[in-house]
Amino acid sequence: MSYQCPLCHQSLLLARQQWRCENNHQFDCAKEGYVNLMPVQHKKSKEPGDSPEMMQSRRAFLDSGHYQPLQQRVSELLEKFLPEKAESLLDIGCGEGYYTAVVEAQLNKRRNLKIYGLDVAKIAVRYGARRYPAVSFCVASSHRLPFADKSLAGVLRIYAPCKAEELARVVKPQGIVLTVTPGPRHLYQIKELIYQNIHLHPLKAEPLAGFELITDESLSYPMKLDGVQAYHLLQMTPFAWRATEDVKKELADRALFECETDFILRVYQRLN
């Protein structure tokens, strides 16, 4: 399996560190090993994706290990529900590859899967490609996936947006999509610092046309963070845009900040 040209949708072939289609559209491999499949005309800004500051905070927080239970559960669900003869898996919105790399390492203990990581942020993909060479990284839009119809056995989507039509297009029959979304009480204690009134609403499962929901579970646990970790956690979320400087300073000065996680994990299977 190879990439698909984002301009004409023909297959891309790799030769001399360059991906090229039969219409002679060319995409160079970066020295770090990733390929940029985001044409200028598809960009909505000069540097799409998260800011460098948000990515630095995310990297620092994730490296502290507080989201390892989610990392592990994602790997377990993929191992359980991926078809036995699966050959490829795509992580949409992979960022720097925190989840992608562990999925690759865990699944390939007994499989031989090609693992792809896709993100719109070039700086995140560059870092991931440098740190995790076993993963094939690309810069691309999650709304225009550079993969052929029915070419992927599975897709991992943690918080990332993606059109249901695109998922139905690229996932093989009997293939799966694993989504992770924040539950009602996710980071509730951070919300308390920012919002006067918090309303908890139960989340209904997202309908994905062409897929059947086969498992729906939550993962919740408490975290004990120091001030630096709490600050990085805030800065890696959209809550940072609403937080005042006083709130940020209060978090950073904490000796201990207790906060809860609440993740919703759902597995969908592609119908024939």
Task: Identify the role of each PLM range.
Residues 219-272:
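Conserved Class I S-adenosyl-L-methionine
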Residues 119-121:
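Conserved SAM/SAH-binding beta-strand->alpha-helix loop
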Residues 85-95:
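Conserved class I S-adenosyl-L-methionine
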Residues 143-154:
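A short acidic, Gly/Pro-enriched loop at the edge of an enzyme's catalytic core
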Residues 174-184:
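Conserved beta-strand signature within the Rossmann-like core of class I S-adenosyl-L-methionine
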Residues 44, 49-73, 77:
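Class I SAM-dependent methyltransferase Rossmann-like catalytic core
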Residues 1-47:
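N-terminal auxiliary segments of SAM/dcSAM-dependent transferases
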Residues 96-110:
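Conserved SAM-binding loop of SAM-dependent methyltransferases across substrates and taxa
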